[in-house]
C-alpha cells in the first residue's frame, strides 16, 4: 500500500511538472492578447480577466491602474480583445445580465486590435446570420452609456 501511495504521488508530481508550464504559457498568451487592445500604459497595468465556459471570470493577473482587459472571445469570428475602465465594466456586466446600465456613469473601452462585433440589430447575437448585420471593425474606442 505504501508503495502504491509513493507511485501515485510521484505520478501526480510528474503530471504537475508537465501541465503547470503549459497552463502558464496559455495564460501568458491570453494576457498578451488582452493587452493588445489598449495603449501599453493601460494594458500593461490592467487587471486581466478571462471569461470561462460557465460564465465566470478567471483573473489571470491583478492590475494596478484601475483598468481591466479581456482576451479574444473564441466564440466570435475575429480577434476582439478589449480593455476598459471601471465604469465600462459596470456597463458590460449589466449588458451580460440583460439589465439596464448604471445611470450617470460614462465608461471607455479600447479595442485597438479591432473587433468582430455582434449584430448591429441584436446585442445578444452569438453568431453571424443572414439577418443580424454582424460587423467586423478596425481599431476603435467605445464610449459607453453616454446618455
Locate predicted features:
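Bacterial N-terminal signal peptides that target proteins for export
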Residues: 1-9
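Bacterial N-terminal signal peptides
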Residues: 9-17
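Sec/Tat signal peptide C-region and signal peptidase I cleavage site
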Residues: 18-24
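Primary mode marks residue(s) on the alpha4-beta5-alpha5 output face of response regulator receiver
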Residues: 25-147
